[in-house]
Amino acid sequence: MQIVIIKEFSNIPLLDHFSESKEICLVAHPDFAAQYGLRYYLKVRQKLQQKLPCHHIDLGIACDDLPGFALEVIAAKVDRLYFLKTSPYWTQIESLCQQEGILIFNQQELSCLL
């Protein structure tokens, strides 16, 4: 799976860049995810899926240590959630993700998000 960190739609590389991988995970950068809002990134995924119909596109949102935003992301049922495992909220957020079938990752493992 090819992981692409995005800030805004114009930040996504050229479409021919994706031809090598049929699975793409767009990850909204934490500095921009809360600012632009979840709907923005859902639209980005939708637009990219329309342009690349033969690809499977997951959406991941990086939330830093913002439990309120993480709850919004979980409610929207995105594919992946990136959260700081050092957060005191990790256990609760992880449990909710498991209940909803959302993959949760330690945000610190993606150095490009730090």
Outline where the language-model segments fall.
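Glycine-rich phosphate/diphosphate-binding loops that line cofactor/substrate pockets in enzymes
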Residues: 15-21
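Conserved, mostly hydrophobic/aromatic
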Residues: 14-15, 73
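Active-site-adjacent beta->alpha loops and helix N-cap segments on the catalytic face
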Residues: 10-13, 33-46, 85-99
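Hydrophobic faces of well-ordered beta-strands that scaffold small-molecule active sites
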Residues: 2-6, 22-28, 57-63, 80-83, ...
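Helix N-cap/beta->alpha junction signal
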Residues: 8-10, 66
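N-terminal active-site wall of soluble small-molecule enzyme domains
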Residues: 27-76
